[in-house]
Swiss-Prot record:
The protein, known as: Small ribosomal subunit protein bS20
Native source organism of the sequence: Cellvibrio japonicus (strain Ueda107) (Pseudomonas fluorescens subsp. cellulosa)
Biased composition (Basic residues): 7-22
PANTHER family the UniProt entry points to: 30S RIBOSOMAL PROTEIN S20, SMALL RIBOSOMAL SUBUNIT PROTEIN BS20C
Family: Belongs to the bacterial ribosomal protein bS20 family.
GO molecular function, one term: small ribosomal subunit rRNA binding
Keywords, in A-Z order: Ribonucleoprotein, Ribosomal protein, RNA-binding, rRNA-binding
Top-level taxonomy: Bacteria, Pseudomonadati, Pseudomonadota, Gammaproteobacteria, Cellvibrionales
Amino acid sequence: MANTPQAKKRARQNEKARKHNASMRSMGRTYLKKVLSAIQTGDQAAAQAAYVSAVAVIDRIADKGLIHKNKAARHKSRLNAKLKAMAA
């Protein structure tokens, strides 16, 4: 347990950051699911719109270091491949 005032403050800050980071990662997963569900329904316009918004969110959380940049690139690449396969 934190004993010094600065250790107590750091514990509070870390908990606040942990909750915020978890929320951001969850938002990223939600946007991925929105794209995948739009692809499943076959609605190309909705899938494209969901993809554009998902890419913005994925890039944002990768820039903040919540996910690795390679993981972000992998997600975007796979989603884009599914969109192209749906269009073909």
